[in-house]
Amino acid sequence: KEVYARGAVVPFVGAGLSVSSGYPGWTAFLKQHIRETAIDPEEFDQILRAGEYEEAAQRLADALGAAFNEVVENAFGRSREISGCVQLLPHVFDSCVITTNFDGVTKRCYEAAGKPFSEELSGEYSRDLPRKLAEGKRILLKLHGTSTTPRGRILTAAEYQKHYGDGN
């Protein structure tokens, strides 16, 4: 309670909170687009069942080429009606939200509640977060970037490798 009262609890929002607003979950998103490629659906399903979503995204990106960026933007860049428990976030957490989501659901929830974020940072600028919070700013940290640009995006295996390395 004490930590929460100080505003030191920061929610980490994943894709599940956007599904109720009509955005696809990762499995649905990836499976939806293999029909547009020559990827073997059974092999692709095996990759997904193994939980290797970054590898599945990489295969899809390789198969679609430049169209992959458009596919991501079309799936997650459209404004949809906000629904579900994500709407409670602005009423529970006031200073910062960290998300891996590409969509704008969290940002729009805070705007609708009259608590817009002072600033939105992509993951590549996450080191600035402590300073921004110390300045009293309400920050949305989009760790994996946004749907509107591949710059700073972390979705495919190559993008994970570029931003996070091999994990050692």
Regions from the language model: what does each represent?
Residues 1-168:
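Conserved catalytic-core helix/loop/strand module for nucleotide-ribose chemistry
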